[in-house]
From Swiss-Prot:
The lineage of its organism: Eukaryota, Metazoa, Chordata, Craniata, Vertebrata. GO terms for molecular function: cell adhesion molecule binding; phosphorylation-dependent protein binding; phosphotyrosine residue binding; protein kinase binding; protein tyrosine phosphatase activity; SH2 domain binding; SH3 domain binding; transmembrane receptor protein tyrosine phosphatase activity. This is Tyrosine-protein phosphatase non-receptor type 6. Keywords: Cytoplasm, Disease variant, Hydrolase, Isopeptide bond, Nucleus, Phosphoprotein, Protein phosphatase, Repeat, SH2 domain, Ubl conjugation. Substrate binds at D419, C453, S454, A455, G456, I457, G458, R459, Q500. It comes from Mus musculus. Belongs to the protein-tyrosine phosphatase family. Non-receptor class 2 subfamily. Monomer. Interacts with PIRB; when PIRB is phosphorylated by LYN at 'Tyr-794' and 'Tyr-824'. Interacts with MTUS1. Interacts with MILR1 (tyrosine-phosphorylated). Interacts with KIT. Interacts with SIRPA/PTPNS1. Interacts with LILRB1 and LILRB2. Interacts with LILRB4. Interacts with FCRL2 and FCRL4. Interacts with FCRL3 and FCRL6 (tyrosine phosphorylated form). Interacts with CD84. Interacts with CD300LF. Interacts with CDK2. Interacts with KIR2DL1; the interaction is enhanced by ARRB2. Interacts (via SH2 1 domain) with ROS1; the interaction is direct and promotes ROS1 dephosphorylation. It is linked to Defects in Ptpn6 are the cause of the motheaten (me) or viable motheaten (mev) phenotypes. Mice homozygous for the recessive allelic mutations develop severe defects in hematopoiesis. The gene is Ptpn6. One of its GO terms (biological process) is CD27 signaling pathway. Expressed predominantly in hematopoietic cells.
Length: 595
């Protein structure tokens, strides 16, 4: 991602940033202070930082040897995807895993960060409203930006999609311009100016900025600013709506994409097992009870779905959840069958048994100090511990036909969720999840965490999404990109209706903002206790990969930028792109060696 490019960062500053906010495998790119026009790749290796020089010859990018690439983005993508290629002279493998992104240049929601021109066109054309616009990063020139605007004219002729105009925004000396004499202090100032005046294309036609296309992606470390933006009221003809309402309404409209089959829950023999007749599990992700008589229709049914963070790679995510409805009298035995077959060791209950006089969940555990039989299993409640926010029960479960096989299960019941709405502040929920995760991580062979409320979608979805986002940030670092709306869409594709209300949607934002703030403070304390020292790394290439891949040429770039519609003169930076610095290059060719 181009947002790993930090235009104003020195080597010592890069080390401080990577050690203070990154994790092993975090990396960033920055301009070289030694050779103008070159770049440096700074990578955290365990607790240290190594710096790799990147040559920009004017025709290609490389590491003073090895593969050659058309763009800086392609070079970084290659070494990110081809793990094990880079190593220090001492043989230490240098892994590029997690981009440490720079802060967004603006908190405005029309800023989309790292998307390609093609992706921008797809978004704007799907919107279909002429003069809708967004701002994104330039893939071809790190540190610059692109203003993409949907025109009012078809791209190729009648019936074709509307044309999208891409206008490059250069950043020079901390000021922004589309060319010519007009410069601005910020992207926001530039956009606000051209919203009033329009932008004249080379053809003489004007491009207008009338309707922003809002993004939901945000740099995790900047989420507090996004919360402030979303809290702002947007004036309309009849009422003022905040950004949270807009985002949640947009999310609700996309539910039509999740029309997966729910046939098992609709079968007559299973209707009595559903707490709410229309809240049913998707067939493709439902938990199927094992060891049941196939001659008994519906015997393998329970209203529960597997949920996984599909936005993380398989090597980044080891956690699976089961989102379930609260137990009915008729489903308690099935619930314990599910817990046993899945080897679940942690159960999270986010409701009281009765709230406002309404039954939310049948108690499916015995009283403390007692034992009960549930179907094929014996369950003992050996201990209960009360805290200000939740109750922890320590349970033992064993099959009736093998009493010597005993598993311990920790049952966390959150008691501080109000009957309506959400908690007034997220600290209690974050502490609750921290305890749950510590327990789960202490059990290396434990199965999925079962999470339930009453219907198994509202509070359940909120808790799961918060935990997923916390895990992503903990894995990738504070400066990773997160997308709360996209995360909810992803879990809704696995269980219908997850995260039910705008209040729950906003609570996720507020919870993650507090998690980020707390994590920053912890990292500052840790970093203040560590020393810092590093130097430029000397990179070698393992023999097996020295020439295993074809070299990329300038003409083979995957990131072909669109024709930019800028008028006026070229920027000074563009005029310098093709200049050679052969004398400087010769001095640095010794910084890499082949094994």
């Amino acid at each position: 991602m181009v947002r790993w490019f930090h235009r104003d960062l020195s080597g010592p500053d890069a080390e401080t940033l990577l050690k203070g906010r990154g994790v092993p495998g975090s990396f960033l790119a920055r301009p070289s202070r030694k050779n103008q026009g070159d770049f440096s790749l700074s990578v955290r290796v365990d607790d240290q930082v190594t710096h790799i020089r990147i040559q920009n010859s004017g025709d290609f990018y490389d590491l003073y040897g090895g593969e050659k690439f058309a763009t800086l983005t392609e070079l970084v993508e290659y070494y990110t995807q081809q793990q094990g290629i880079l190593q220090d002279r001492d043989g230490t493998i240098i892994h590029l895993k997690y981009p440490l992104n720079c802060s967004d240049p603006t908190s405005e929601r029309w800023y989309h960060g790292h998307i390609s021109g093609g992706q921008a066109e797809s978004l704007l054309q799907a919107k279909g409203e002429p003069w809708t616009f967004l701002v994104r990063e330039s893939l071809s020139q790190p540190g610059d930006f692109v203003l993409s605007v949907l025109n009012d004219q078809p791209k190729a002729g009648p019936g074709s999609p509307l044309r999208v105009t891409h206008i490059k925004v250069m950043c020079e000396g901390g000021r922004y311009t589309v060319g010519g004499s007009e410069t601005f202090d910020s992207l926001t100032d530039l956009v606000e100016h051209f919203k009033k005046t329009g932008i004249e294309e080379a053809s003489g036609a004007f491009v207008y900025l009338r309707q922003p296309y809002y993004a939901t992606r945000v740099n995790a470390a900047d989420i507090e600013n996004r919360v402030l933006e979303l809290n702002k009221k947007q004036e309309s003809e009849d009422t003022a709506k905040a950004g949270f309402w807009e985002e949640f309404e947009s999310l609700q409209k996309q539910e039509v994409k999740n029309l997966h089959q729910r046939l098992e829950g609709q079968r007559p023999e299973n209707k009595s097992k559903n707490r709410y007749k229309n809240i049913l599990p998707f067939d493709h992700s439902r938990v199927i009870l094992q060891g049941r008589d196939s001659n008994i229709p519906g015997s393998d049914y329970i209203n529960a779905n597997y949920v996984k963070n599909q936005l993380l790679g398989p090597d980044e995510n080891s956690k699976t959840y089961i989102a379930s409805q609260g137990c009915l009298d008729a489903t308690v035995n099935d619930f314990w069958q599910m817990a046993w077959q899945e080897n679940t060791r942690v159960i999270v209950m986010t409701t009281r048994e009765v709230e406002k006089g309404r039954n939310k969940c049948v108690p499916y555990w015995p009283e403390v100090g007692t034992q009960r039989v549930y179907g094929l299993y014996s369950v003992t409640n050996s201990r209960e511990h009360d805290t200000a926010e939740y109750k922890l029960r320590t349970l033992q479960i064993s099959p009736l036909d093998n009493g010597d096989l005993v598993r311990e299960i920790w049952h966390y019941q959150y008691l501080s969720w109000p009957d309506h709405g959400v908690p007034s502040e997220p600290g209690g929920v974050l502490s609750f999840l921290d305890q749950i995760n510590q327990r789960q991580e202490s059990l290396p062979h434990a199965g999925p965490i079962i999470v339930h409320c009453s219907a198994g979608i509202g509070r359940t979805g909120t808790i799961i999404v918060i935990d997923m986002l916390m895990e992503s940030i903990s894995t990738k670092g504070l400066d990773c990109d997160i997308d709360i709306q996209k995360t909810i869409q992803m879990v809704r594709a696995q269980r219908s209706g997850m995260v039910q209300t705008e209040a729950q949607y906003k609570f996720i934002y507020v919870a993650i903002a507090q998690f980020i703030e707390t994590t920053k403070k912890k990292l500052e304390i840790i970093q203040s206790q560590k020393g810092q020292e590093s130097e430029y790394g000397n990179i070698t290439y393992p023999p097996a990969v020295r020439s295993a891949h074809a070299k990329a040429s300038r003409t083979s770039s995957k990131h072909k930028e669109e024709v930019y519609e800028n008028v006026h003169s070229k920027s000074k930076k563009e005029e310098k792109v093709k200049k050679q610095r052969s004398a400087d290059k010769e001095k640095n060719k010794g910084s890499l060696k082949r094994k």
